[in-house]
From Swiss-Prot:
InterPro entries: AAA+_ATPase, EccCa-like_Actinobacteria, EccCb-like_Actinobacteria, FtsK/SpoIIIE/SftA, FtsK_dom, P-loop_NTPase
Function summary: Part of the ESX-3 specialized secretion system, which is important for iron and zinc uptake or homeostasis.
Naturally occurring in which organism (per UniProt): Mycobacterium tuberculosis (strain CDC 1551 / Oshkosh)
Lineage of source species: Bacteria, Bacillati, Actinomycetota, Actinomycetes, Mycobacteriales
Gene it is expressed from: eccC3
Subcellular location: Cell inner membrane
Record-linked PROSITE patterns: FTSK
Location (main, coarse): membrane
Subunit description: Part of the ESX-3 / type VII secretion system (T7SS), which is composed of cytosolic and membrane components. The ESX-3 membrane complex is composed of EccB3, EccC3, EccD3 and EccE3.
Protein name: ESX-3 secretion system protein EccC3
Gene3D superfamilies cross-referenced by the UniProt entry: P-loop containing nucleotide triphosphate hydrolases
Length: 1330
């Protein structure tokens, strides 16, 4: 049976009905009467008696003539008596009460008329939505057929009859103090009015199917069926078959009561046929009906009592009183399913009344509802529909079928005018893209329908400039939350994108908040970018601004260059440019750029400077085909400045206040738009300033798209024969074939309309130009950065990451150039900003393009140990941490020696001409310091608050660059960089800072710091000094890639020169010749340059050695004794050795030399030595010439005192030298020891040495004479300081050498007990130090 498609139109507006409040004034009050006291009641009578008595007295006394003055006093008493009697009488007169009562009753009469008018409107509205069943026959084919949609308030509400209902308007009486005081007649009239008018009788009342899952109906069978027919008639008249389905199970299916259902399209089973056409959900067996409905019921969720717009509602009627519904699958409530069961079993007395499963009884023309314990009136006059009337209605509806595009994308307001129907698209899943993108006339370009007007006509949105007949170029849209602003924006975008290729239109969607709907357009070929969530990622807002400025500049330059080429002068607008193309000039097309700035007021709140940007782009964009649609929830005139003045068309959706509505569309209509989801997308369009607002509703495009259903089955009869049309299924004849194609066309998963269209458009035509590059959000692997940079090897340039330049619409490599003035670099960043990782990238990138002989790195790791991962790289000479002070000092020693060596070679700078590197094996050398703050706080004390090595770093920064020595540092604070160093750091990169106020990056005229836009959660992201965002590449240091091993494999046998360390045991032969001349002994190796340390006793004959036990004091004495003895004779050298602990007892001395361990021998030995040395002074009386030629005769005498702190410095208490101190004879000779041939060497413990230097006369004199001092290992906490230097825990034989120079020197003393020839700096040798 073929049917006509019924095209539903906009629903007719029902009669208006108010649901406000009528406030009724309270009745008048009567004052309360309080009885007076006995005295007050008696006092007037007493005064009257007094007056009469006075008059009698006057007459009795003979005063015949009474003067007025005499009568004054009685008159006053009379007035007082009257006042006492009437003054406090609060009783109202009867006339006053009657008058107020009459006024109030007249007032109630007016109120009654108003209430009746409201009640009449309510009844008329109810009768409009729910007319009498007898009127339903006239509805089919009219505009009202199938008028209800899921968003209508009366959707699935079926009229059951007439009943007394509450008045929709609230009646409220003003508060009164107490009802006792009210005037009784007025009060009674008010109560009567309220009791009568608060309800309306005989009003159509319905049953909401969305709120009930099962209805059980009892009563006489004929009446019950008549009632159910009325319900079904109401349902099928007002509801489209796509939103409502009807199913019936009845024993007498072919009888008059139910046979008429077969004509209704609501009972058809989609995709199934029988011998007569569409199969029907009609059966004589409830179980068979359940089997037919099985696929429909299977996936439905449980019943919740809430509307289910996405599901087709099923009304299932089971007319079988004997069927046990509770034991069937229909007993379980399902969403979008209502089961009506005709039952014969009355509920038992204690049965609970379930509001979701009501039990109704039809009796005496009324309907009662079961409440726990008994029946209660439900419908006063139940509707009944005869079988003939139902058959007549069904036959009238049978000729119509629903529009297949009804479901899904058709809203209640636009009705059949969906997105596809407005654009003339039959099936959005099979678009004819070439036809949609076909060239248009200029007046039709950028002109698309986006909804329907209040009269049902398509609303055309014309984006062109008003000079070309459009509404543009710029517009303003305001709509509060829930107004459908996003829905309207998506409708505009989808209409434009579907009908225009990327050669004619490109789009930038900028959403400051980050709505999910914007992402739906990300894959469209015309969409340049969807920029969302700019509130959290402030850098995106900056990129958006730069992109707009850059596109304006790009189009301006393109018009200028093309105009000069074509006509000799620049084109003034894109229109002139297109005219040149039409004239035959070969020019690339310039598409219109449509910018949607959603939530732009929030953007201006955070970035007020962008108001000038929008104003600039809006003014320039008119000629350059850059159109902007500003959208927001509210309008803050103070923030948007002149933006609204640059807009031509206005769109006002539901707004929060009348004032905002007036600002947008000129009237308050946008404020009066009703709230609720059924009114989303309703608004007013003002196409030009001063134009009349046009009410419209945008199409809904964000729903699931269901393609038009094609016939799934075909009936082919070999010999056509007429058949009787019955309600039950009709089996086909043997010669009839039903071909089912369900399996040939599997159903695709549900997809939204936007995604369905976007996928098809992406396969056609060109894509939009890449005006917006992806932001620096994704990690850049170092391998990718190397490939993109295109830097060749041996150029001493390498990429570090990428710089984002949205204004130029490109991303450039961040390249370090070692040969430029920016050869020194500082990376400034806060905690966890990626500083250490940036250094890893720096080193690995350089190593990937250069050999270890071309670049080498020496690292000081104060940043957490990340540089330690590169210590095995062939290009890395050393990685030293804060726990390796010796390696740090040696690193500076190596670099300073390298600098000195290169300074002495004049040809070093000439290497740049041919790209050659110096032949010293280092190449370009980089000192890398991770965390300058930690480095500057290391090796400090209370007198030196900063690391002394900082001065050496500054020297390398300012001098080393010219000699191929570079300094790369990171710091958490720019203040940690010394002033003298800052100018030498040519490349400054700033990562995320803890406080943006510490940033050194500034933009002239900007209201905020660029550092505010650097993301918090992206290490490696930062700014150049030009305020350009960059991102360091990731070094890819993982077990799988292992770049260190891969790079080392490319340079086998090559490595950067390592940092040489002092040996832990220094053999005598490792330093060459030990005796360099008279009194010149090599005692060790210097840390600074690993050169031999020569002890020149001729220049300074005094030597102090301090150190704790087994630090090497005695070993040094042993070396000195052996070296001097092996290179001298007894006539030239003599020794006096004081050795309390017998450590030097086995060292052979010359004959007659003094060796003593006895304390008693010290004083005579010192006296004898003093006499010997005193005798070497020149005799008295010599002339000046004789003195100049005079020298003493004799040997050089070495006085060696081991452990001088063990020798008591107190006077002798007994013996021949009583009162004599041991060192007193010697102290006077120390100042001239060098001239008199005396060499004094003393050793002592480190602990307490600082105290001894102040208390011991001998050591104090040594210190005064600036004796050479060696500080071996000692406890820094207990040993104090010597000449400002503190002891340190050093290995055996390691000492700090203090001379008359400015800085101390670390040395390794020779161990004469080591037999090996030489010990390398990294190898531990066996040997002992004592």
């Amino acid at each position: 049976m073929s049917r006509l498609i019924f095209e539903a139109r906009r629903r007719l507006a029902p009669p208006s009905s108010h649901q406000g409040t009528i406030i009724i004034e309270a009745p008048p009050e009567l004052p309360r009467v309080i009885p007076p006291s006995l005295l007050r009641r008696a006092l007037p009578y007493l005064i009257g008696i007094l007056i009469v008595g006075m008059i009698v007295a006057l007459v009795a006394t003979g005063m015949r003539v009474i003067s007025p003055q005499t009568l004054f006093f009685p008159f006053v008493l009379l007035l007082a008596a009257t006042a006492l009697y009437r003054g406090n009488d609060k009783k109202m007169r009867t006339e006053e009460v009657d008058a107020e009562r009459a006024d109030y009753l007249r007032y109630l009469s007016v109120v009654r008329d108003n209430i009746r008018a409201q009640a009449a409107e309510q009844r008329a509205s109810a009768l409009w939505s729910h007319p009498d069943p007898t009127a339903l026959a006239s509805v089919p084919g009219s505009r009202r057929q199938w008028e209800r949609d899921p968003h209508d308030p009366d959707f699935l509400v079926l009229r059951a009859g007439r009943h007394t209902v509450p008045l929709a308007t609230t009646l409220r009486v003003n508060d009164t103090a107490d009802e006792i005081d009210l005037e009784p007649v007025s009060h009674s009239a008010l109560r009567s009015l309220l009791d009568t008018q608060r309800s309306i009788g005989d009003v159509p009342t319905g049953i909401d199917l969305t709120k009930v899952s099962r209805i059980t109906v009892l009563g006489e069978r004929a009446q019950v069926r008549a009632v159910l027919r009325a319900w079904i008639a109401q349902a099928v008249t007002w509801h489209d078959p796509t939103v409502l389905g009807v199913a019936l199970a009845a024993r007498d299916l072919e009888g008059r009561d139910w046979n008429w259902l077969k004509w209704l399209p609501h009972v058809d089973i989609p995709g199934r046929l029988d011998a007569l056409g569409p199969a029907r959900n009609l059966s004589t067996d409830p179980d068979e009906l359940i089997a037919l409905l099985g696929p429909v019921l299977a996936d439905r969720p449980a019943f919740t009592g809430q509307p289910t717009d996405a599901l087709r509602h099923l009304l299932i009627v089971v007319d079988d009183p004997d069927y046990d519904l509770g034991a069937s699958p229909l007993a379980v409530g399902r969403a979008g399913v209502t089961v009506v069961h005709c039952s014969a079993s009355a509920p038992h007395r204690e049965q609970y009344s379930d509001p979701e499963k009501p039990i109704l009884r039809v009796a005496h023309g009324a309907i009662e509802r079961w409440q726990t314990g008994g029946w209660q009136p439900y419908i006063d006059a139940a509707d009944q529909f005869s079988a003939d009337e139902a058959a007549h209605l069904a036959r009238r509806l049978s000729r119509w079928d629903s529009n297949p595009t009804h479901a899904g994308l058709r809203s209640a307001a636009t009705r059949g005018a969906s997105f596809t129907t407005l654009l003339g698209i039959e099936d959005a899943s099979r678009l004819d893209v070439p036809a949609l993108w076909a060239p248009r006339r200029r007046d039709e370009e950028l002109r698309v329908p986006i909804g329907v007007t209040g009269t049902g006509e398509p609303l055309m949105f014309d984006l062109k400039d008003e000079a070309e007949g459009g509404m543009g170029p710029h517009g303003l849209m305001i709509g509060m939350t829930g107004s459908g602003k996003s829905q309207t924006l998506m409708s505009i975008l989808l209409s434009l994108l579907t009908t225009h290729s990327a050669e004619r239109l490109i789009v930038i969607y900028a959403d400051f908040k980050g709505e999910a709907g914007a992402d739906s357009f990300r894959d469209f070929p015309q969409v340049v970018a969807v920029i969302s969530n700019m509130a959290e990622k402030k850098s995106l807002a900056d990129r958006f601004a730069d992109t707009l400025r850059g596109e304006v500049a790009r189009r301006e330059m393109l018009l200028r260059e093309a105009g000069r080429k074509v006509q000799g002068s620049a084109f003034n607008s894109v229109l002139e440019y297109e005219n040149a193309i039409a004239a035959g000039h070969s020019l690339p097309p310039i598409p219109t750029l449509f910018v949607v700035a959603d939530e732009f007021t929030l953007m201006l709140a955070d970035h007020p400077e962008y108001a000038e940007l929008f104003d600039y782009v809006a003014r320039k964009g008119r000629s350059f085909r850059i159109h902007i649609l500003f959208a927001s929830q509210t309008l803050d005139v103070g923030k948007i400045k002149d933006i609204d003045k640059n807009t031509a068309y206005r769109i006002g959706l539901k707004v929060a206040s009348p004032s905002v509505s007036r600002q947008i569309i000129g009237v308050e209509d946008a404020y009066h738009i009703e709230s609720g989801k059924e009114h989303k997308g309703v608004g007013f369009l003002v196409p030009a300033p001063g134009a009349t607002p046009i009410r419209f509703r945008s199409t809904y495009v964000d729903g699931i798209y269901e393609p038009p259903q094609t016939a799934k089955a075909v009936v082919v009869q070999s010999v056509p024969e007429p058949k009787l049309f019955t309600a039950a299924a009709v089996e086909p004849d043997p010669g009839t074939v039903i071909a089912d194609t369900d399996e040939q066309e599997p159903a695709d998963p549900p997809r939204k309309l936007i995604a369905t269209i976007g996928e098809q458009l992406a396969r056609y035509g060109p894509r939009a130009p890449q005006l917006w590059l992806p932001p620096l959000d994704e990690t850049i692997p170092l391998s990718a950065a190397l490939a993109r940079a295109g830097v060749g090897p041996r150029q001493w340039r390498w990429p570090l990451g990428e710089i984002d330049r949205p204004f130029e619409m490109r991303r450039d490599p961040l390249v370090f150039d070692a040969r430029s003035s920016a050869g020194n670099m500082v990376i400034h960043g806060g905690p966890k900003s990626g500083k250490s990782t940036a250094l890893q990238t720096f080193i690995l990138s350089a190593a990937s393009l250069h050999s270890p002989h071309e670049v080498s790195f020496y690292c000081l790791d104060y940043g957490g140990g990340q540089l330690r991962a590169l210590q095995d790289l062939a290009h890395v000479g050393s990685v030293a941490s804060a726990l390796e002070p010796e390696r740090i000092r040696r690193t500076f020693g190596e670099l300073e020696q390298l600098l000195l060596s290169r300074q002495q070679r004049e040809v070093f700078r000439d290497r740049g001409a041919n790209g050659s590197t110096p032949d010293d094996g280092f190449g370009e050398v980089f000192l890398v310091i991770d965390n300058l703050y930690g480095f500057g706080r290391d090796n400090t004390d209370q007198f030196n608050t900063r690391n002394p090595l900082l001065a050496r770093v500054t020297e390398l920064v300012n001098v080393g660059l010219a000699y191929g020595i570079h300094v790369i540092i990171t710091t958490p604070s720019w203040l940690e960089v010394p002033l003298a160093m800052r100018d030498g750091l040519g490349l400054r990169l700033e990562l995320r800072l803890h406080d943006a106020r510490d940033s050194n990056v500034r933009v002239v005229g900007a209201l905020r710091r660029p550092a505010d836009a650097v993301p918090h959660d992206q290490p490696g992201r930062g700014l150049t000094m030009a305020a350009e965002h960059f991102l360091f590449a990731a070094p890819e240091l993982d077990a799988q890639t292992n770049p260190v091993a891969a790079i080392n494999a490319r340079y086998p046998g090559m490595a950067a020169p390592p940092v040489r360390l002092l040996p832990t045991n220094l053999a005598p032969h490792a330093v060459g010749e030990l005796y360099r001349g008279p009194d010149q002994l090599v005692i060790g190796q210097r840390e600074e340059d690993l050169a031999p340390v020569i002890l020149d006793l001729a220049a300074n004959p005094l030597l102090m050695v301090f150190g704790d036990a087994r630090s090497g004091k005695t070993t040094l004495l042993r070396h000195i004794i052996r070296t001097v003895r092996e290179h001298s004779t007894a006539d030239r050298v003599a020794f006096t050795v004081l050795d309390r602990r017998l450590h030097l007892v086995d060292e052979p001395l010359f004959p007659d030399n003094e060796y003593t361990a006895n304390i008693d021998r010290i004083i005579p030995a010192m006296l004898g030595l003093a006499n010997l040395i005193e005798a070497r002074r020149p005799p008295a009386g010599m002339s000046a010439a004789e003195l100049s030629r005079w020298t003493f005769a004799g040997h050089t005498h070495y006085l060696i005192i081991d452990d001088v702190d063990q020798v008591p410095d107190s006077p002798a208490m007994t013996g021949p030298y009583i009162g004599q101190r041991p060192w007193t004879p010697l102290i006077g000779l120390l100042a001239q020891a060098g001239d008199l041939g005396l060499r004094v060497i003393v050793t002592g413990r480190a602990t307490g040495s600082a105290h001894l230097l102040m208390t011991s006369p001998l050591l104090r004199r040594f210190n005064d004479l600036q004796a050479t001092t060696l500080m071996l290992a000692g406890n820094p906490a207990d040993s104090g300081k010597i000449r400002g230097e503190r002891f340190a825990r050093l290995p055996a034989g390691r000492a700090i050498l203090l001379t008359d120079s400015d800085s101390p020197t670390y040395v390794q003393l020779i161990n004469p007990l080591v037999d090996a020839a030489a010990v390398s700096g990294e190898t531990q040798q066996k040997g002992s130090q004592s």
